[in-house]
Amino acid sequence: MKLIGITGMPGSGKSAITKLAEKYKITVVSMGDVVRHETSKQGLILNPENVGNTAVKLRELHGKEAIAIPCLNYVNEKYNCEDFVIIEGIRSIYEVNYLKKHAKLDIIAIHSSPKTRFDRLSGRNREDDSNDWNTFVERDERELNFSIGNVIALSDYMVVNEGNYNDFIHDLENTLKNIIKAD
């Protein structure tokens, strides 16, 4: 199994990989979907506080790689060992280490400034996003407490998403092509 991990702070542009993945016929598994599913399963409203608290509780109960385990189990059940699979939303170095024990893994970090990310999240209208700056900052702090900063700093590739969307997609696609070609 060849995994491509996508990391970045909320609103950085991680989900853009989904459109490229379709083009290259690569499956995307979202770690955030695992957390949102668990939040809903508990009967909680999908909002930044509940989703964030669920992520924290899952890691407290099942270890710091708690979100990576069901993602990898799903991938192993559904896909051929020769397939590329993208794991979107890696947040901790523990998740990276867990995935690397079980598969070849390259990490792409997507970076955007806090202001750019806040503007995007404010307009995205997803249940677990907020248009309140203080809630945004709290979410960033929670993400940083998961050690996402370490994952970003130690990533294999970095794509900056500050300007034109088409330029970002072009850079992201070139990075994806380089990973596929290197294999």
From Swiss-Prot:
This is UPF0200 protein MmarC7_0527. GO terms for molecular function: ATP binding. Pfam families: AAA_17. ATP binds at residues 8-15. Belongs to the UPF0200 family. HAMAP family: UPF0200. PANTHER family: DEPHOSPHO-COA KINASE (PTHR41930:SF1), UPF0200 PROTEIN MJ1399 (PTHR41930). Keywords: ATP-binding, Nucleotide-binding.
